[in-house]
């Protein structure tokens, strides 16, 4: 792009122009300053509305946190964790989330920079020859930047708001991950306990089968079957223990814990709620409240403002003015002003305008796509939630009680010498397997419940999040007995004792 430099020497009105040019950047420089909170207060409010707890931004590098935050972390870790405590811990100590918060500082700096004029340019020239010395001085200011300052500041402010919504979305995501990891860790621990019961039962059956074969009361094939089941139960328990370790480590990562690994989990998952949620206007609520939908709208609005700025500066992209002073040996000093602008001889700004229009069109369609996906995700998530609740209730009200009654009937038949001890042990194993399936169904329900809340409040359900206004939160409360505890060894011993009394 060619540039045309126009200079005039003016003997009058120069002081006025100089004063105006010098005063403008000084005045405008005070219009944009850094906020005391760095833009974080809005992030805290958005997160609190959806999670129930506000995050904390550790703005001091290093491992140090405030004494108040450290005290709260120690307090939460000093008692068995709950879903809500896991969420609060994650918002206090997750370092990945702190890294996302640091992006706010970048956006805040860009906003302040956009609200200030570019620094003036000063030039000094010194020529000497033939006994003559010529000195040129000039000070140049960006007039175009001054004229477009309000629009540029508004665009940067919207970009900061985008960064705030992105940070809040990240905070809700971390809270959701912590909540889901909590339910997974508790369920995995329960499954280990019931897996140990299966191994105990299989161990008793295998040892009894070996003794009965030695006594000639059991054939070799039946004895090997019992032994094979015992071996498979041991292998299954090993896998369950690893899954428990993996689930606990996932929770540790979500909480952002480093050396503090001795946190305690509750014994059981929370009970299944008596009634399922019935959402009203869930799709409309999601479109209005979801952070990703709001973020897409903000991006489209900021792109529209950028498009307006591009159109306004389409033909003149460089416009500078300033004071010029020239002195020469033996001649009076000359004062004037200089204007520098860029002439659109080869590019009339069509490429920049076309690019800005394409970006706006992209943002417009992305916003519509996000809203469409939000509605679909709400319907899908509620279907998963309702299926999980129905399935868990079916296990709670039908399968587990039926297994218990079958076990009681089998014990009566064993005491009446109508079934063998192997049938009694096999039935106890089946009961444990049924209880384990109920634990899995209950875990899946709580995860589905949490993901539904995430879909309604923030964005795609990658994890769980508590507390939204769209649907009442099902209070998990303290962990209570999720399923009956079946002690296979004790059951076998009581059966043998009952058999002895019968004789």
What is each model feature region?
Residues 232-259, 366, 402-458:
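Short segments within alpha-helical structural elements
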């Amino acid at each position: 792009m060619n540039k045309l430099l126009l200079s005039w020497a003016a003997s009058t009105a120069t002081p006025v122009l100089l004063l105006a040019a010098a005063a403008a950047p000084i005045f405008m420089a005070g219009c944009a300053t850094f906020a005391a909170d760095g833009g974080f207060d809005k992030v805290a409010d958005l997160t609190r509305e959806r999670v129930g707890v506000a995050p904390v931004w550790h703005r001091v590098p290093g491992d140090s946190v405030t004494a108040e935050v450290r005290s709260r972390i120690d307090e939460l870790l000093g008692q068995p964790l709950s879903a809500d405590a896991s969420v609060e811990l994650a918002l206090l100590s997750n370092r990945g989330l702190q890294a996302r918060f640091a992006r706010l500082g970048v956006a805040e700096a860009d906003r302040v920079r956009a609200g200030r004029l570019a620094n003036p340019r000063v030039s000094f020239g010194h020529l000497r020859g033939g006994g003559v010395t010529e000195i040129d001085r000039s000070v140049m200011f960006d007039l175009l930047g001054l004229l477009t300052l309000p629009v540029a500041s508004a665009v940067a402010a919207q970009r900061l708001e985008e960064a705030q919504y992105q940070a809040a979305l990240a905070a809700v995501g971390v809270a959701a991950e912590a909540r889901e990891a909590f339910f997974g860790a508790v369920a995995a621990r329960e499954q280990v306990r019931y897996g140990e019961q299966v191994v105990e039962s299989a161990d008793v059956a295998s040892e009894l089968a070996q003794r009965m074969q030695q006594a000639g009361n059991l054939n070799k094939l039946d004895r090997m079957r019992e032994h094979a089941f015992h071996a498979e139960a041991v292998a299954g328990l090993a896998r369950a223990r690893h899954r428990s370790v993996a689930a606990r480590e996932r929770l540790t990562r979500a909480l952002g814990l480093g050396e503090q690994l001795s946190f305690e989990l509750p014994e059981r998952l929370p009970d299944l709620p008596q009634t399922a949620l019935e959402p009203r206007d869930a799709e409309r609520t999601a479109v209005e409240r979801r952070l990703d939908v709001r973020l897409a709208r903000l991006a489209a609005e900021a792109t529209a403002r950028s498009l307006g700025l591009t159109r306004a500066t389409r033909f003149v992209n460089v416009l500078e003015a300033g004071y010029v002073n020239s002195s020469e040996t033996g001649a009076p000093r000359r004062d004037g002003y200089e204007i520098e602008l860029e002439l659109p001889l080869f590019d009339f700004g069509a490429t920049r305008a076309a690019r800005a229009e394409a970006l706006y069109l992209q943002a417009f369609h992305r916003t519509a796509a996000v809203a469409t996906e939000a509605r679909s995700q709400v319907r899908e998530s509620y279907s998963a939630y309702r299926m999980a609740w129905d399935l868990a209730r079916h296990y709670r009200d039908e399968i587990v009680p039926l297994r218990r009654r079958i076990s009681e009937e089998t014990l009566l038949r064993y005491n009446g010498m109508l079934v063998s001890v192997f049938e009694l042990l096999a039935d106890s194993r089946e009961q444990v397997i049924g209880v384990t399936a109920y634990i899995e169904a209950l875990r899946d329900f709580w995860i589905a419940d949490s993901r539904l809340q995430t879909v309604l409040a923030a964005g795609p359900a990658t994890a769980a999040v508590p507390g939204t206004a769209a649907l009442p939160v099902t209070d998990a409360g303290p962990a209570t007995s999720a399923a009956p505890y079946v002690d296979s060894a004790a059951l076998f011993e009581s059966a043998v004792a009952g058999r002895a009394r019968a004789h």
